[in-house]
Amino acid sequence: MNLTLVLNGERRVMEAVRTVAELVAALGLDPRKVAVERNLEIVPRSAYGATELADGDQVEIVHFIGGG
């Protein structure tokens, strides 16, 4: 199933992605090091697997980067 998402401001077609967890994995990201917002609502990490995506969803993913 293909979904068209607005991902970090860019329109992207994602294949075989149904949930936030699948999206994070498809992008090769470590779920422990990102925060995800779907349609202006923060998605708790514990809900990534249960949060289904729909065509046209707006998703923002922010990476945590350590520094000093």
Indicate where each model-derived feature is located.
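Ubiquitin-like/PB1-type beta-grasp interaction modules and other compact soluble beta-rich domains
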Residues: M1-G67
